[in-house]
Amino acid sequence: KGFEYTQMVGFPVAQGYNNSDEFKWCKALSFHSIKIPLMQNKFSVSYYESAVYGNYFNPAYLLPAPWALISRVSGFSENVLSGISFQTNILPCFSISTDFMMNDIDLKPFIKLKWNDAAIRGAFKTGIIYTPKYSLFRYIKLDYCIVTPYTYTSCDSSDKKYNFSDYTNYGLCMGTELLPNSHQLGIV
């Protein structure tokens, strides 16, 4: 089985800065990912990106190219998230997945291992899923997720009334249910 490519465009609704009951329909969300299976589909790696912006439509986010690079080189002000995920299914009925997502990072202090100065905005999630063939349970899942401060939050300075750069739809978070600066251990 070969690689999988996914492309999606959606149109969430922007919430007002000063009035949380005020909304506007001029926001766009683009998402794409590529998943590459390895070791006869027992291991896969995926790279994904999403961009959220508003008051215009940017066709650059329809290209199957690195959007983080497009955004930085072109000077666009969109909020671009990039991530990489790994999944392994080496044993039957048992899978392990890990996901790293970056919202923003200052690379110079990060490379110098000065974590407090790197302004890391991102999330990490890892988990184990067991799906027994003969059991009362469909699956058993254990996972851990952490979201650093200010992740998903972004301010669009070009519009003083609506925030077109945050990952919300009608004021509700489109990412994980966890708010920035939080973590969670889950057992299902």
PLM region descriptions:
Residues 186-188:
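C-terminal amphipathic "assembly/sorting" segment characterized by alternating charged
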Residues 2-184:
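Signature for the C-terminal beta-barrel architecture of outer-membrane proteins
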